[in-house]
C-alpha cells in the first residue's frame, strides 16, 4: 500500500511541475555529458527516418 501511495504522489507531483522534468540539471560530475543528454530524445526519430531512407533505397518493395 505505501508503494501505491508514493507512486501516486510522484505522478501528482510531476503533473504539478511538468517543467522541472524537462529542465532537470545533471549533477556536477556529469556536466560534460550535457550536450549528449540534450540530443538523446531525438535519437528515436533518426531511426524512424532511417526506415524511410532504407525503403527508398530498395524502391519501397
From Swiss-Prot:
How does the record say this protein sits in the membrane?
Single-pass membrane protein
Disulfide cross-links: none
Q: Name one GO biological process term.
A: photosynthesis
Please, which domain of life does this record's source organism belong to?
Answer: Eukaryota
Short name of one Pfam family:
PsbK
- Which InterPro entries does the entry link to? PSII_PsbK, PSII_PsbK_sf
Would you identify the family this protein belongs to, as annotated? Answer: Belongs to the PsbK family.
Report what the protein is called.
Answer: Photosystem II reaction center protein K
Give the organism the record lists: Hordeum vulgare
Q: What is the lineage of its organism?
A: Eukaryota, Viridiplantae, Streptophyta, Embryophyta, Tracheophyta
Amino acid at each position: 500500500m505505501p508503494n501505491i501511495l508514493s507512486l501516486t504522489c510522484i505522478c501528482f507531483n510531476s503533473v504539478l511541475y511538468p517543467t522541472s522534468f524537462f529542465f532537470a540539471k545533471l549533477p556536477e560530475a556529469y556536466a560534460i555529458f550535457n550536450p549528449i543528454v540534450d540530443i538523446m530524445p531525438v535519437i528515436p526519430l533518426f531511426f524512424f527516418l532511417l526506415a524511410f531512407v532504407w525503403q527508398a533505397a530498395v524502391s519501397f518493395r
